Swiss-Prot record:
One of its GO terms (cellular component) is cytoplasm. Its main location: cytoplasm. This is Chaperone protein DnaJ. The J domain is necessary and sufficient to stimulate DnaK ATPase activity. Zinc center 1 plays an important role in the autonomous, DnaK-independent chaperone activity of DnaJ. Zinc center 2 is essential for interaction with DnaK and for DnaJ activity. HAMAP family: DnaJ. Its cofactor is Zn(2+). CXXCXGXG motif repeats lie at residues 147-154, 164-171, 186-193, 200-207. The gene is dnaJ. It comes from Colwellia psychrerythraea (strain 34H / ATCC BAA-681). Zn(2+) 2 binds at residues 164, 167, 186, 189. A zinc finger (CR-type) spans 134-212.
Length: 378
């Protein structure tokens, strides 16, 4: 697809002055800037075209090449080519024109932004009780902190960083390659725009030093494995006074010997005697708040699940509380004496001679087996 004439794009004549080109660009850039067009793709493309045209016509050498060769001057590995080279980003070269309108724009001619310190992660192992109830604890974190003697500047006390004489504080320099200009990070100041002549001896000019910090962390009630607690600004300090990163406390809840947690519900198994299962009765079941009584109805079968509402975990994100699910497991008696064994045999004989069915699962099992073989015969 053919590209529009750069002069036509900016709406200026071929003999327009640098001031006229700049004025036209500023007007169009403000009109079509993505911050004002709310995601309108067609206006985004127009903005790219306007920016590309300005980058060519505002540079004397590029403008002369364009006047002589047209768009062909910037194809085949040149400074842009193909329509996307000059407009492939927003705000890379117009911070000096209207950066005050859009909060600094981004500007390849402006100093690079300070690099904030790295985020850190600290792993915490908690018991289920501490996770459910919450806990305050102290942690020790090896990190970088701002250097106190130089107040994070990196410069010796009583001195300050000076504007870089190579890039004049911009952080970038232009390298000429024939007709084209390429911006690169300033090799003198590494893109910071300033250089430190007299470095702080404590931090060697970095503005930060290694230290182990002791921090107080409040673990909220209801946390679970995988939850993170963010401590803003407690990560590594940035170099030369740059903002610090954040510290993330990563929670891991250890397995419990009695309870298994599923979201805000707790599950446990409670052993009961076969007498209690048959005749019913009250038993004690454990909860995280202590033991509570549970009424077991007669003829309860092993595996029966009982729900104790509100005895689970209070949600860390809402006011709801989960339940405690208790599964009863009927224990087979062991270490029986001879008399006890005889009593069980007598009970079994009496139950076998009774006309009533006393083993619902056993009866159901044999009925199922009989039906299976009857089906095979048919």
């Amino acid at each position: 697809m053919s590209k529009r004439d750069y002069y036509e794009t900016l709406g200026v004549s071929q003999d327009a002055s640098e001031k006229e080109v700049k004025k036209a660009y500023k007007k169009l850039a403000m009109k079509y800037h993505p911050d004002r067009t709310q995601g309108d793709k067609s206006k985004e493309e127009t903005f790219k075209e306007v920016k590309e045209a300005y980058e060519i016509l505002n540079d004397d050498q590029k403008r002369a090449a364009y006047d002589q060769y047209g768009h062909a001057a910037f194809e085949q590995g040149g400074n842009g080519g193909g329509g996307g080279g000059h407009g492939g980003g927003f705000g890379q070269d117009f911070g000096d024109i209207f950066g005050d309108i859009f909060g600094g724009g981004g500007g390849g001619r402006g100093r690079q932004r300070q690099q904030r310190g790295s985020d850190l992660r600290y792993n915490v192992d908690l018991s289920l009780e501490d996770a459910v109830k919450g806990k305050s604890l102290e942690i020790k974190v090896p990190t970088y902190v701002s250097c106190e003697p130089c107040d994070g500047s990196g410069a010796k006390k009583g001195t300050s960083a000076k504007t870089c004489s190579t890039c004049h504080g911009h952080g970038q320099v232009q390298m000429r390659q024939g007709l084209f200009a390429v911006q690169q990070t300033c090799p003198t100041c590494s893109g910071k725009g300033k250089v430190i002549a007299d470095k702080c001896t404590s931090c060697r000019g970095q503005g930060r030093v290694e230290k182990t910090k002791t921090l107080s962390v409040k673990i909220p009630a209801g946390v679970d494995t995988g939850d993170r607690i963010r401590l803003s600004g407690e990560g590594e300090a940035g170099e030369h006074g740059a903002p610090a990163g954040d510290l993330y406390v990563q929670v891991n809840v250890r397995d419990h010997e009695i309870f298994v947690r599923d979201e805000n519900h707790l599950y446990c198994e409670v052993p009961i005697s076969f007498v209690t299962a048959a005749l019913g009765g009250d038993i004690e079941v454990p909860t995280l708040g202590g033991k509570v009584k549970l009424k077991v109805p007669k003829e309860t079968q092993t595996g029966k699940m009982f729900r104790l509402r509100g005895k689970g975990v209070k949600s860390v994100r809402s006011s709801t509380t989960g339940d405690l699910m208790c599964k009863v497991v009927i224990e087979t008696p062991v270490n029986l004496s001879g008399d006890q064994a005889d009593l069980l045999r007598q009970l079994e004989e009496k139950m076998a001679s009774s006309s009533k069915k006393h083993s619902p699962k056993e009866t159901g099992f044999f009925d199922g087996v009989k039906k299976f073989f009857d089906d095979l015969k048919s």
